[in-house]
Regions:
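Conserved C-terminal structural/oligomerization subdomain of aldehyde/semialdehyde dehydrogenase
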Residues: 14-15, 21, 45, 63-206
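Short linear capping/connector segments at secondary-structure termini
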Residues: 22-28
């Protein structure tokens, strides 16, 4: 059912120039960055087919009219992806979606937590208990509950866990402020001029 519902939506994704001209429709996504980037994404799709995943929507070789020399690729959709496949293990950085099937909530959680990457994840449910369990135990830096892409606003921290993290701090939010802040700590103590005290050489306490 998921694959049947997703296929027409992926096929309908519009790709073209990142900045449309007057009269042109807005695009869902633009071209990739370089020819090498396009080759990498294309090779991932080919690898997925060779490994046995079911390619439901193939975005390879798609070129918008008037932009045939651009680094374009259409949306692609795989079904029956398994955790031992390259397209599951590695980040593709292209418009390629893979459906991985799990038999239970616990199995799905295990798949996420055993993956080396942990940027963002989401759960869709009407069960508040399952949502709390997911948010508490899932090993990812950004969690969405009935939100498909859990990228927070700039006043929240943005970043992942595990191999999706590149620093002890994330970007945006309080971590972004800390990154650009040089801390200074000043400790002061003013004696009471009406109280005579002997000299003290220990750490002062309040």
């Amino acid at each position: 059912a998921e694959a049947d519902a997703l296929s027409p939506k992926v096929e309908a994704l519009r790709y073209g120039p990142g900045i449309p001209k007057d009269g042109e429709k807005e695009m869902d996504f633009g071209p990739l960055i370089t020819q090498q980037h396009l080759n990498n994404v294309t090779n991932y799709i080919t690898t997925g087919v060779e490994e046995g995943a079911t390619l439901l929507v193939d975005g390879r070789g798609k070129k918008p009219v008037g932009h045939e020399n651009g680094f374009f690729i259409g949306g692609s959709l795989f079904d029956n992806v398994t955790s031992d496949m390259v397209i599951y293990k590695e980040e593709i950085f292209g418009p390629v979606l893979g459906i991985v099937r799990a038999k239970s909530f616990e199995e799905a959680m295990k798949l996420i937590n055993e993956h080396p990457y942990g940027n963002g994840t989401a759960i869709f449910t009407s069960d508040g208990g399952a949502a709390r369990e997911f948010a508490y135990h899932v090993q990812a830096g950004m969690v969405g509950i009935n939100v498909p892409i859990p990228v927070p606003m700039s006043f929240h921290c943005f970043g992942g866990w595990k191999h999706s993290s590149y620093s002890t701090l994330n970007v945006y939010g309080p971590d972004g402020v800390r990154f650009y802040t040089k801390m200074k700590t000043t400790t002061t103590r003013w004696p009471n001029k009406y109280v005579i005290e002997n000299a003290a050489f220990s750490m002062p306490t309040l």
